[in-house]
């Protein structure tokens, strides 16, 4: 019997455009689009776009949220992000983005079930505090490459030029509400764009259209691994 798996909002787009698909951690994901070398080159010299929807996302909200994060690390300021180990199995560390005084988004880190459980344990006894798994509620798009910021400027985010690595901003993106997180990868400018799942494919296509002049290419998990793996990043792809 086949195991159940989840589909991202852009799944049908990937299939229509010839992606090689595989199951990764319970999700059907695009591994590549038939030309890994070109995908990696596009990211290194221009801009590439990846469907990162399966990335674990946990919403933490309430007036005691900062107090909870102070149990693990120095809580970031509003509009800032930081990495932190939130449990014994967080590898790599989780990434914490502070959206408002009382609201945070926690990305990655431990398998989301363990991460949600660990955060709820940490929140115990702190009063007004809510921890919610929102992984499937948001589409996540990873935009990487030296032209990524110029591309985003075409889609309307406010104050995009002033955003440095480790910053986050809630802003209209292609006319829908989005969350932008700047998280560079080994010196390569990179952004994570979170929008409501319902708008996922629409925003995906808007980004691709805006990136046409920059030679944008979609890339899959194979290219993502090459660019993010410390040992693989300097290897020539053939």
Protein language model features and the residues they cover:
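Basic, glycine/lysine-rich polyanion-binding surfaces/domains
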Residues: 1-238
């Amino acid at each position: 019997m086949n195991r159940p798996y989840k589909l991202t909002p852009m799944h049908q787009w990937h299939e229509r455009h010839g992606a090689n698909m595989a199951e990764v951690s319970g999700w059907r994901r695009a591994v590549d689009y038939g030309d890994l070398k070109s995908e990696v080159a596009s990211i290194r010299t221009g801009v590439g776009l990846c469907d990162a929807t399966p990335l674990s996302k946990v919403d933490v909200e309430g007036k005691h949220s900062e107090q909870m994060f102070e149990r693990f690390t120095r809580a970031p300021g509003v509009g800032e992000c930081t990495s932190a180990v939130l449990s014994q199995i967080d590898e790599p560390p989780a990434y914490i983005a502070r959206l408002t005084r009382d609201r945070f988004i926690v990305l990655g880190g431990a398998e989301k079930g363990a991460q949600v459980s660990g955060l709820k344990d940490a929140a115990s006894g702190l009063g007004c505090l809510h921890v919610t798994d929102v992984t499937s509620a948001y589409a996540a798009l990873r935009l990487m490459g030296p032209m990524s910021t110029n591309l985003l400027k075409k889609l309307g985010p406010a104050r995009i030029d002033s955003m440095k690595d480790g910053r986050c901003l809630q802003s209209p993106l292609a006319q829908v509400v989005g969350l932008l997180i700047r998280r560079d990868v080994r010196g390569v400018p990179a952004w994570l764009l979170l929008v409501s799942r319902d708008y996922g494919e629409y925003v995906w296509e808007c980004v691709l259209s805006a990136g046409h002049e920059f030679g944008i290419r979609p890339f899959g998990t194979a290219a993502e691994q090459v660019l993010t793996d410390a040992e693989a990043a300097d290897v020539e792809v053939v």
